[in-house]
């Protein structure tokens, strides 16, 4: 029994080290919850943050080079949702792929908390207004991550299911180097959530869904 537990632990640790969960041979579960989940868009960069005091959480999700077969806007920053591509989210749930792309010729910097970017998923509520269905927890451990020209980060995002059918998108709050704050929105897509996801925040417990997510 101890050997089995040790083997499972080794597999879990190897997945975490890669920074991106691999598909499990078992069918992926649907994510049907009744609360706002904490943000999970963690990113790393090869450029060190010389302004941070240290002690912040790190990530293994490093940038990738834009390839010729990728259809991405040139000359701008873009947040791209790819709902038609299923990926593993939090090791056992069906998710979708999201790209944050630097199509400019400049190195871009992004504020983060424990390497968590300011990205959340939003949905149109019953009143027809865009509202977040995820939230960013408070943290004193701020840091910067950098994205070089023609690079992008790839994320596995939550694909929610629920009784309320709606439109969804992702929103990035980006503070440029001149301290000007901008909102960057992804393309919209069809999906569903539960009504409580607009108001009830996930409890900060050791058994939360995000404890199974790879940074």
What are these regions (language model features)?
Residues 4-13:
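Sec-dependent N-terminal signal peptides
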Residues 17-21:
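Boundary at the C-terminal end of the N-terminal hydrophobic targeting segment
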Residues 22-95, 103:
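Low-complexity, acidic Ser/Thr/Pro/Gly-rich terminal tails and inter-domain linkers that flank the onset
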Residues 26-28, 35-53, 59, 156-215:
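Terminal connector regions
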Residues 82-85, 138-142, 155-156:
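Short structured motifs
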Residues 93-97, 152-154:
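Intrinsic-disorder/low-complexity, polar/charged segments enriched in Ser/Thr/Lys/Arg/Asp/Glu/Gln
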Residues 105-147:
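The feature marks short-to-medium sequence segments in extracytoplasmic or secretory-pathway proteins
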Residues 146-157:
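Short Pro-Gly-centered flexible turn/kink motifs
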């Amino acid at each position: 029994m101890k050997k089995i537990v040790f083997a499972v632990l080794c597999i879990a640790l190897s997945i975490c080290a890669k920074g991106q969960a691999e598909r499990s041979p078992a069918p992926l579960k649907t994510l049907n919850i009744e609360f706002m989940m904490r943000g999970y868009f963690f990113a790393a960069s090869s450029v060190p943050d010389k302004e941070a005091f240290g002690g912040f959480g790190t990530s293994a999700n490093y940038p990738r080079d834009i390839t010729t077969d990728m259809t991405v806007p040139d000359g701008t920053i873009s947040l791209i949702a790819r709902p038609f591509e299923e990926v593993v989210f939090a090791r056992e749930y069906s998710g979708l792929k999201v790209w944050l792309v630097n199509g400019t010729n400049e190195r871009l910097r992004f504020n983060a908390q424990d390497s968590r970017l300011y990205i959340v998923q939003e949905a149109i509520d019953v009143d027809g207004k865009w509202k977040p269905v995820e939230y960013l927890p408070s943290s004193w451990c701020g840091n910067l991550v950098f994205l070089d020209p023609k690079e992008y980060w790839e994320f596995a995002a939550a694909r929610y299911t629920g009784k309320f059918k709606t439109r969804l998108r992702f929103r990035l709050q980006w503070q440029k180097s001149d301290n000007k704050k901008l909102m960057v929105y992804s393309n919209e897509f069809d999906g569903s959530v539960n009504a409580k996801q607009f108001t009830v925040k996930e409890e900060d417990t050791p058994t939360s869904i995000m404890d199974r997510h790879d940074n």
